[in-house]
Amino acid sequence: MSFRSLHSGLKSIAILIVAGFALSQSTSAQYQQQQPPQQQPAPTPAPAGKASPSNAPQAPAEAPKIDPEEEKAYKTFYDTNAPQQADIRIKLGEQFLVKYPQSRYVEQVYARLMQDYLDKQELDKMYDAADKALAINPDDVTVLVVTGWVYPHNYNPDEPNAEKRLSEAEAKEKHALDVLSKLPKPANLTDEQFAKAKDSAASQAHSGLGLIYFRRQDYANSITELQAGEKIAATPDATDFYVMGVELQSLKRFSEAADAYQKCAQIPGALADRCKQRTDEAKKSASTQPAGPKP
């Protein structure tokens, strides 16, 4: 079963990107603050009879210089945020990275490009941008969640290193949940906004884990993760309910499968008709076959 053409969760991903931008900035700042200071070389011993250089007055360290052109270029990129401007934004972002490879905004640019490449289904470019963002900040929640979610939805078991990539996606989602549990509230978000942004990210992480375990046919853990995600999801995901229905049906928990399919059928989209048909099948099985054991 392939979900390569099923992207009912992309709306949730887009919401996550918007809500999670402040989370991304927060984790970036937090990560930078946690980095150990670079070791300074030991002072050269002073010649005999002369004062040690370490005792001499030291000039204060200069603040990083701000390049007005760099700031302007980033603002132009940041403000080009309408969905129909994706091609322009990609061009601006790629130009920015070439011209300002050491900019303090590089991580945010890569994270935004990751989303744009995903929207265009240029997955190789998406993964490359994500890897570069995580190389700068391994705690970027948005990047961790999105890449961990996308891979199991586009999983190909015949791909080289398919299981390795599933394991990498699993590690990203688990790390994202760990970061979220410790994340301080950014100053520019209210308590309510922060809670919603965290729930959005956590819901997508649980959804990603659910699909990863589904690909491994670990249905019990998959169901647990998908249910955890749906409990806090602002927007229900038809794919998650469909997968739960498939798993519950395989476990002969037909009544629960019918309930999952029914929830899927109520969500407008490509899966609605299929889920309606599956609902009827599961209800029929529930009335004619013995139910499987519950966990």
Predicted regions and their residues:
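Short coil/turn linking the two alpha-helices of tandem helical-hairpin repeats
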Residues: 80-82, 117-121, 148, 152-160, ...
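Terminal, low-structured helical/coil segments at or just beyond the last alpha-helical repeat
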Residues: 186-188, 199-215, 224, 250, ...
